[in-house]
């Protein structure tokens, strides 16, 4: 980015990357070194500005230091718990001519220990708890994906018979069609995984932060459980929930060790309890969404998308109702196919992120699923899509509201709608102005054909699906509630 406003515009993206453990290397321009501190044109102290939102940053004022800084930046960003780094380079350093820089090896940085040694006493203690458990439960987070441990998680679950639920960022790390998979956990997660959090006797959290979207009211969270927490970042262990056994390690190494120490076992009745609870959700929520009487629903749009892509597309979601619906109804079959803004909840994320996913995985189908509110926050990126002919498919679920905020205003604030209703442009004409083929679908009998047309397009394509204005997303955890307090329908009026 350029100096000044170009650099400060990176802050939200860096914050998003930091909390979601995304490796990013940002290079910013800066004024001449002799002008630093003089409030020169487009001078901002970007290094101090970005300290809270980066894993590491540095300012380079001499050309000889550029190569070591770049090598160190890429190493730090991608190792350990990944995260964003920033290099700020002054104008004079950019203008200097230097000889070919030498290769810089950065695998030994003083005080930086990206991969902790596995402590076998902790593994043995965890295995003892697991072997004695009657109702064990695995919560699988993004750390599984970051360590490449999906296969190890599958082997561990199959050997021990332990049910697996995924967090928002963990989706895709475990096959959704596996009998041990019990669903998506959290604020708008499936009924079974949420309710049974307070029924398990051993809870195994792997590569997750136990943040508020996963726990709800932490004082009442998993009260019957003895908790095992596996994470590469020591700062996350016991930060929110009290951990009985902490395994500070790479998830893949920890799971490999646990597979060796844990005894073969099955828990059919325990897994069946998840199925029964999820059936209650189906009867009250999913059945209604898949058998609608009037407008298209978000659930049926995403279900059709999942079926047509066989769960194999890279799906990039924005933030809001559509994000939660996609997490519940899209059957992510493969690791690293679910891309979303989980911790920061950054509206406008999906369109630029989908562009990056498409460029990074050119052999994969990439679909950006976006609400009409978030879409307009970065809609200018249609110009980039047009310029570089990026074949991303854009699916906007249009309910003419900032739907998630409206849902809370409706359910808990007596429909006092404030700044949530949208006045939208003609999205089809807007896409066409960028020379992107576009279509709008409102009728149920045209939905499948419209989605197929979008997916079959050789280049970029825009599809607007008009859904019910006041459709709500259930299950949901009410404010102040624990995840086990999850609601399947609007709360009764007092």
Where are these regions (language model features)?
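Flexible, glycine/charged-enriched surface loops at secondary-structure junctions
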Residues: 82-85, 265-278, 462
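Generic enzyme active-site microenvironment
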Residues: 86, 229, 316, 369-370
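Active-site diphosphate/adenylate-binding microenvironment
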Residues: 277-352, 357-358
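Conserved short loop/turn motifs at secondary-structure junctions
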Residues: 141-145, 291, 371-373
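Structural motif
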Residues: 202, 314, 365-367
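Short beta-strand segments
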Residues: 88, 316-318, 464
